[in-house]
């Protein structure tokens, strides 16, 4: 018997309320069974690959001053979705599996998407940065407001954790190595 889908309620700045639902491989019907009606609904699953019905699935529903919208996602691996409102750029950034998505937070229109070669570990945003930082298992990259990659850093070990601390991107690898990057340039700082 498959486990029940997971659910999370989140609040984003600007009066946005989000509800995430996600589940394992082939659980799309269970994840979407409790979808609420009203507002627009767009399935971005095909951006993850060809056979999305066998993939893990997720749904994000946003309610806010600009209206209600929902987006569906797919991933070939089980993942917990994450999101951050990049208020200075006016973009709701979400990640699921290998893909990062940039949405208009009021309408839900997809402005851009970026697919990583490895699963995404963390999504970091700050109003002090001109980009969001996406941490995948073996690369760190900065995505600009228009969806272009501002900089990219490859790693020789799998990154298991990432955070913005003291004005630095601090990465912990599978072997326990800690690396610090300048969040504006991606250059290593010691």
Sequence positions of predicted segments:
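Short loop/turn segments that connect beta-strands within the blades of beta-propeller domains
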Residues: 56, 88-89, 96-98, 128, ...
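Blade-level signature of beta-propeller repeat domains, shared across WD40, Kelch, NHL, RCC1
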Residues: 171-190
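WD40 beta-propeller blade core
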Residues: 101, 141-142, 179
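A short beta-strand motif characteristic of beta-propeller blades
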Residues: 66-76, 109-115, 147-154, 190
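Extracellular-facing segments of soluble proteins and assemblies that are Gly/Ser/Thr-biased and enriched
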Residues: 85-114
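Repeated scaffold domains used in trafficking and secretory/extracellular systems
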Residues: 6-9, 15-38, 43-50, 70-89, ...
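A short helix->beta-strand "capping" segment at the edge of beta-propeller domains
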Residues: 2-4, 12, 58-78, 105-107
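Short loop/turn segments that connect beta-strands within beta-propeller blades
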Residues: 105-107, 144-148, 183-185
């Amino acid at each position: 018997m498959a486990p029940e889908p997971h659910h999370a309620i989140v609040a984003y700045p600007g009066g946005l309320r989000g509800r995430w639902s996600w589940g394992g491989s082939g659980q799309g019907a269970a994840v979407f069974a409790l979808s609420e009606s009203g507002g627009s609904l767009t399935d971005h699953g095909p951006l993850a690959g060809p056979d999305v019905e066998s993939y893990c699935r997720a749904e994000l529903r946003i309610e806010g001053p600009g209206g209600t919208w929902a987006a569906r996602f797919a991933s070939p691996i089980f993942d917990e979705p994450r999101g951050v409102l990049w208020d200075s750029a006016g973009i709701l950034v979400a990640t699921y599996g290998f893909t990062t998505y940039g949405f208009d937070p009021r309408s839900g229109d997809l402005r851009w998407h970026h697919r990583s070669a490895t699963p995404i570990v963390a999504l970091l945003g700050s109003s002090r940065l001109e980009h969001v930082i996406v941490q995948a298992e073996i690369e760190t990259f900065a995505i600009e407001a228009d969806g272009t990659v501002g900089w990219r850093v490859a790693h020789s070990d799998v990154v298991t954790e990432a955070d913005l601390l003291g004005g630095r991107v601090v990465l912990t690898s599978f072997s326990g190595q800690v690396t610090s990057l300048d969040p504006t340039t991606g250059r290593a700082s010691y």
